[in-house]
Amino acid sequence: MKTLKVNIVTPDGPVYDADIEMVSVRAESGELGILPGHIPTVAPLKIAAVRLKKDGQTELVAVSGGIVEVRPDHVTILAQTAETSEQIDKERALAAKRRAEERLQKQTPDVDIIRAELALKRAINRLDVAR
C-alpha cells in the first residue's frame, strides 16, 4: 500500500517522523483526511488529535494548533506543541484541566477567559490522546 512521509515538528524539535497510510487532522475549516496523492494544501490547525493510520493501527498525537502542509507524498505539521500518547504526563494534564476549570468557574476580573478556555481545550486534548 502507498504511504506518505509524515513529519510533526514543534519549535523544540521533531516529535514524529514515519511513513503512514493516512493522516487525519482537524483544520480550522473542518476535518481533513489525507491519503497519498492528495492535492497540495496548507491549512491552519485547531487544538485536536492528529490520527496516523498504518497497518490497521492508529496512533494519536496531541497537537495544540499550528499549520499542516500537504504535498502528494509528504505531510508536514508545524505545531505550537505536540506530544505522542507515550510522552503525555497524565497527572500533569489532569492538573492543568482542573486549574483551567477553576479559573473558568471563578470568572473574576483578573481571569483571562479566552486563555483559560484554550488551556482547558489543550488539557482535554492531551488527556484524550493519553487514553
Swiss-Prot record:
Keyword Protein biosynthesis: no
Compartment list: Cell membrane
Membrane topology: Peripheral membrane protein
GO MF entry, a single one: proton-transporting ATP synthase activity, rotational mechanism
Keywords carried by this UniProt record: ATP synthesis, Cell membrane, CF(1), Hydrogen ion transport, Ion transport, Membrane, Transport
Main location: membrane
GO cellular component labels: plasma membrane; proton-transporting ATP synthase complex
InterPro entries registered for this protein in UniProt: ATP_F1_dsu/esu_C_sf, ATP_synth_F1_dsu/esu, ATP_synth_F1_dsu/esu_N, ATP_synth_F1_esu_C, ATPsynth_dsu/esu_N
Membrane-spanning intervals of the chain: none
CDD domains attached to this UniProt entry: F1-ATPase_delta
Keyword flag Oxidoreductase: no
Subunit structure: F-type ATPases have 2 components, CF(1) - the catalytic core - and CF(0) - the membrane proton channel. CF(1) has five subunits: alpha(3), beta(3), gamma(1), delta(1), epsilon(1). CF(0) has three main subunits: a, b and c.
Task of the protein: Produces ATP from ADP in the presence of a proton gradient across the membrane.
HAMAP family: ATP_synth_epsil_bac
Family note: Belongs to the ATPase epsilon chain family.
Protein's name in the database: ATP synthase epsilon chain
Gene: atpC
